[in-house]
């Protein structure tokens, strides 16, 4: 599979970072995965969805409930952080499609395994896995 060009990945990440967020807190985070071993581990965490390992790059989006909760309390923790991370991922998706890249929204995964694989803080909540690349024709 062809690799996603660095300038295209940069555009995808810039689009994601331009997404609005509650109170402009940006209570979201992203991990960029290119390592094949890590992608294979994510396949296992995502219930065997093999295409994740085949993608050139995999973006994993997280909500940061505590960051939002410090300003907005329980509503920030349970709603705003989730909305922020989802919009963040959606902007990345839209930019990838605009660049004629193939991507698939993966929402079926074991949260704890994803956090363990990517060594994230315990309060980060995985929201979506977005494998990006060029589809086989």
Residue ranges and their predicted role:
Residues 37, 116-119:
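Short secondary-structure transition/capping segments
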Residues 1-10, 129-137:
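Specificity-determining recognition surfaces
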């Amino acid at each position: 599979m062809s690799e996603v060009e660095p300038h295209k990945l940069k555009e995808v990440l810039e689009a994601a970072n331009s997404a609005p967020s509650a109170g402009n807190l940006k209570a979201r985070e992203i991990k960029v995965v290119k390592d094949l071993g890590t992608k294979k581990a994510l396949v296992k965490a995502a219930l065997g969805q093999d295409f994740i390992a085949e993608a050139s790059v995999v973006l994993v989006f997280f909500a940061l409930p505590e960051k939002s909760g410090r300003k907005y309390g329980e509503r920030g923790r349970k709603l705003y952080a989730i909305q922020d991370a989802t919009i963040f991922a959606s902007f990345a998706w839209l930019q990838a499609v605009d660049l004629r890249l193939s991507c698939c929204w993966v929402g079926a995964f074991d949260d704890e395994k994803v956090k363990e694989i990517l060594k994230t803080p315990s309060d980060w909540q995985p929201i979506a896995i977005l494998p990006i690349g060029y589809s086989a024709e």
